[in-house]
């Protein structure tokens, strides 16, 4: 019961639409193409350094162990079949526990939790990567991106957001600045880089909060 409540707190606003903007175009959140955020691994097909945070498959946002000031815009929990990489089957996805249970009842694979998290990353001090940070909001430039997290990455990002939402229910997640960082993890003979979100004491600027509310259609 507690898990369900936490999920609703974090993701309740992700499906609402945007009102008509000054361009006169009726826009819905689903109509917006948000670039992907990835953490480069040894097997990644990218020239970026291993462990770096990559935006839109092109821009290196930060090297490993270097926090990026970030606002969490939205987060949505889901479930998918835990199919090994060597298999050719495409995992089926569910966005509710009932849908996940229905898939699990007929699947040979276990269902595993994952999340889609939309982040507003602030341009670091001294960064000249202006092409990546094309959203001027208040006194800073930002990049709006989305990251898909599962397993260890799910625990170090979405679960921390959900815990904050449950324990600080009167404080919107987007009102706080979070440190977004790529960290090296090891298990046995395997080593990889894992995304992590940690809340800070810094409050988000009023302009940023207004942007997020407008984006979510609040």
Q: What is the role of each PLM region?
A:
Residues 123-164:
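Short acidic, glycine/tyrosine-flanked loop/strand segments centered on an H-E-D-like triad
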Residues 113-118, 131, 140-145, 171-178:
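Generic beta-strand structural signal
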Residues 85-97, 152-157, 169-175:
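Short linear motifs at secondary-structure transitions and domain/linker junctions
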